[in-house]
Design a protein with these regions (language model features):
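Alpha-helical segment that forms one wall of the substrate-binding/catalytic cleft
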Residues: 64-68
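Divalent metal-dependent phosphate-bond-processing catalytic cores, especially two-metal-ion Mg2+/Mn2+ enzymes
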Residues: 7-14, 18-39, 44, 48, ...
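Beta-strand segments within the central parallel beta-sheet cores of soluble alpha/beta enzyme folds
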Residues: 80-90
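Non-catalytic interface/linker regions that flank or bridge core catalytic/transmembrane domains
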Residues: 1-7
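Amphipathic alpha-helical scaffolding segments
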Residues: 1, 62-63
Length: 171
Protein backbone atom coordinates (compact mmCIF):
# COMPACT_ATOMS: atom_id res chain seq x y z
CA UNK A 1 0.00 0.00 0.00
CA UNK A 2 3.00 2.26 -0.61
CA UNK A 3 2.44 5.53 -2.44
CA UNK A 4 4.49 5.88 -5.60
CA UNK A 5 7.37 8.34 -5.68
CA UNK A 6 6.30 9.17 -9.24
CA UNK A 7 3.73 11.93 -9.44
CA UNK A 8 2.28 10.28 -12.57
CA UNK A 9 0.73 7.59 -10.36
CA UNK A 10 -2.59 8.42 -8.76
CA UNK A 11 -2.88 5.05 -7.04
CA UNK A 12 -0.69 3.28 -4.52
CA UNK A 13 1.75 0.85 -6.10
CA UNK A 14 -0.24 -2.24 -5.13
CA UNK A 15 -3.50 -0.78 -6.46
CA UNK A 16 -1.74 0.27 -9.67
CA UNK A 17 -0.39 -3.27 -10.24
CA UNK A 18 -3.90 -4.70 -9.78
CA UNK A 19 -5.27 -2.08 -12.21
CA UNK A 20 -2.62 -3.07 -14.77
CA UNK A 21 -3.40 -6.76 -14.43
CA UNK A 22 -7.14 -6.14 -14.79
CA UNK A 23 -6.50 -4.51 -18.19
CA UNK A 24 -4.64 -7.50 -19.66
CA UNK A 25 -6.51 -9.85 -21.96
CA UNK A 26 -5.95 -12.88 -24.17
CA UNK A 27 -6.02 -10.98 -27.47
CA UNK A 28 -2.57 -10.14 -28.84
CA UNK A 29 -1.86 -6.88 -30.65
CA UNK A 30 -0.91 -8.94 -33.71
CA UNK A 31 -4.41 -10.42 -33.91
CA UNK A 32 -3.94 -13.78 -32.21
CA UNK A 33 -4.62 -15.11 -28.74
CA UNK A 34 -2.19 -15.93 -25.96
CA UNK A 35 -1.94 -19.59 -25.02
CA UNK A 36 -2.30 -20.44 -21.33
CA UNK A 37 1.43 -20.25 -20.50
CA UNK A 38 2.04 -16.92 -22.23
CA UNK A 39 -1.10 -15.43 -20.69
CA UNK A 40 -0.06 -16.66 -17.26
CA UNK A 41 3.37 -15.01 -17.68
CA UNK A 42 1.72 -11.78 -18.83
CA UNK A 43 -0.59 -11.69 -15.81
CA UNK A 44 2.30 -12.47 -13.45
CA UNK A 45 4.33 -9.65 -15.00
CA UNK A 46 1.37 -7.31 -14.63
CA UNK A 47 0.92 -8.00 -10.94
CA UNK A 48 4.67 -7.69 -10.22
CA UNK A 49 6.02 -5.18 -12.76
CA UNK A 50 6.58 -2.48 -10.11
CA UNK A 51 7.70 -4.81 -7.32
CA UNK A 52 11.16 -3.22 -7.44
CA UNK A 53 9.85 0.23 -6.49
CA UNK A 54 11.22 1.21 -3.13
CA UNK A 55 13.25 3.97 -1.59
CA UNK A 56 16.74 4.53 -2.96
CA UNK A 57 16.28 2.15 -5.92
CA UNK A 58 17.22 3.98 -9.12
CA UNK A 59 16.08 1.30 -11.61
CA UNK A 60 12.95 -0.38 -10.29
CA UNK A 61 12.57 -2.51 -13.44
CA UNK A 62 16.00 -4.11 -12.97
CA UNK A 63 15.39 -4.49 -9.24
CA UNK A 64 12.04 -6.16 -9.89
CA UNK A 65 13.59 -8.48 -12.48
CA UNK A 66 16.06 -9.58 -9.81
CA UNK A 67 13.25 -10.65 -7.45
CA UNK A 68 10.68 -12.06 -9.90
CA UNK A 69 12.49 -15.31 -10.82
CA UNK A 70 13.12 -16.15 -7.17
CA UNK A 71 9.46 -15.62 -6.28
CA UNK A 72 7.99 -17.48 -9.25
CA UNK A 73 10.42 -20.41 -9.05
CA UNK A 74 9.55 -20.79 -5.37
CA UNK A 75 5.86 -20.79 -6.34
CA UNK A 76 6.50 -23.66 -8.77
CA UNK A 77 5.97 -21.96 -12.14
CA UNK A 78 7.50 -23.56 -15.22
CA UNK A 79 10.90 -22.19 -16.30
CA UNK A 80 9.50 -20.63 -19.51
CA UNK A 81 6.82 -18.75 -17.58
CA UNK A 82 9.44 -17.52 -15.10
CA UNK A 83 11.76 -16.41 -17.92
CA UNK A 84 9.02 -14.58 -19.86
CA UNK A 85 7.71 -12.79 -16.76
CA UNK A 86 11.25 -11.78 -15.80
CA UNK A 87 11.96 -10.28 -19.23
CA UNK A 88 8.65 -8.41 -19.15
CA UNK A 89 9.30 -6.94 -15.71
CA UNK A 90 12.86 -5.97 -16.69
CA UNK A 91 11.73 -4.35 -19.95
CA UNK A 92 8.32 -2.98 -18.97
CA UNK A 93 9.43 0.62 -19.54
CA UNK A 94 11.55 -0.03 -22.63
CA UNK A 95 8.94 0.07 -25.40
CA UNK A 96 7.56 3.42 -24.25
CA UNK A 97 11.04 4.83 -23.56
CA UNK A 98 12.30 3.80 -27.00
CA UNK A 99 9.19 5.20 -28.70
CA UNK A 100 9.48 8.58 -26.96
CA UNK A 101 13.22 8.93 -26.41
CA UNK A 102 14.74 7.37 -29.52
CA UNK A 103 14.00 7.34 -33.24
CA UNK A 104 11.52 4.48 -33.74
CA UNK A 105 12.26 4.55 -37.48
CA UNK A 106 15.98 3.91 -36.94
CA UNK A 107 16.64 0.22 -37.75
CA UNK A 108 19.31 0.08 -35.02
CA UNK A 109 16.72 1.06 -32.40
CA UNK A 110 14.30 -1.61 -33.62
CA UNK A 111 17.12 -4.16 -33.59
CA UNK A 112 18.11 -3.20 -30.04
CA UNK A 113 14.54 -3.73 -28.86
CA UNK A 114 14.33 -7.05 -30.73
CA UNK A 115 17.60 -8.14 -29.09
CA UNK A 116 16.30 -7.32 -25.60
CA UNK A 117 13.32 -9.58 -26.30
CA UNK A 118 15.44 -12.40 -27.77
CA UNK A 119 13.79 -11.82 -31.18
CA UNK A 120 10.61 -13.39 -29.76
CA UNK A 121 7.48 -11.94 -31.38
CA UNK A 122 5.23 -13.28 -28.64
CA UNK A 123 7.33 -11.49 -26.00
CA UNK A 124 7.00 -8.30 -28.05
CA UNK A 125 3.21 -8.74 -28.16
CA UNK A 126 3.19 -9.27 -24.40
CA UNK A 127 5.40 -6.23 -23.82
CA UNK A 128 3.09 -4.06 -25.92
CA UNK A 129 0.06 -5.19 -23.92
CA UNK A 130 1.88 -4.67 -20.61
CA UNK A 131 3.04 -1.21 -21.73
CA UNK A 132 -0.47 -0.18 -22.74
CA UNK A 133 -1.99 -1.54 -19.52
CA UNK A 134 0.69 0.16 -17.42
CA UNK A 135 0.35 3.51 -19.18
CA UNK A 136 -3.43 3.49 -19.00
CA UNK A 137 -3.41 2.62 -15.29
CA UNK A 138 -1.39 5.58 -14.06
CA UNK A 139 -4.35 7.79 -13.37
CA UNK A 140 -3.29 10.61 -15.71
CA UNK A 141 -4.75 10.55 -19.22
CA UNK A 142 -4.70 12.74 -22.29
CA UNK A 143 -5.75 16.21 -21.23
CA UNK A 144 -5.14 15.47 -17.56
CA UNK A 145 -1.66 15.83 -16.16
CA UNK A 146 -0.17 15.29 -12.79
CA UNK A 147 2.98 17.45 -12.62
CA UNK A 148 3.10 17.44 -16.42
CA UNK A 149 3.55 13.66 -16.72
CA UNK A 150 1.09 12.11 -19.12
CA UNK A 151 -0.58 8.74 -18.93
CA UNK A 152 -1.83 6.82 -21.96
CA UNK A 153 -3.15 8.92 -24.82
CA UNK A 154 -3.89 8.51 -28.53
CA UNK A 155 -0.53 10.10 -29.27
CA UNK A 156 1.35 7.70 -26.96
CA UNK A 157 -0.58 4.74 -28.40
CA UNK A 158 0.44 5.80 -31.90
CA UNK A 159 4.15 6.20 -31.21
CA UNK A 160 4.37 3.06 -29.07
CA UNK A 161 2.55 1.09 -31.76
CA UNK A 162 5.02 2.47 -34.32
CA UNK A 163 7.96 1.27 -32.23
CA UNK A 164 6.24 -2.10 -31.75
CA UNK A 165 5.77 -2.43 -35.53
CA UNK A 166 9.40 -1.52 -36.24
CA UNK A 167 10.67 -4.07 -33.71
CA UNK A 168 8.32 -6.73 -35.08
CA UNK A 169 9.69 -6.11 -38.58
CA UNK A 170 13.24 -6.49 -37.20
CA UNK A 171 12.39 -9.94 -35.85
Amino acid sequence: NRPSASAAHRYTIDRHMVEVTSRLGRETPSGGRYDDDHFKALLLAGITHDIGKRAFVADHAAEGARHVPVIFKRMGYAPDIVDWATVLVREHLTLSEFATGKDPYDPAVAEELADRLHHDKMLLDMLFDLTRADGSSLGATAGETITKQYGWSKWREQIVRGMYSAARAAM
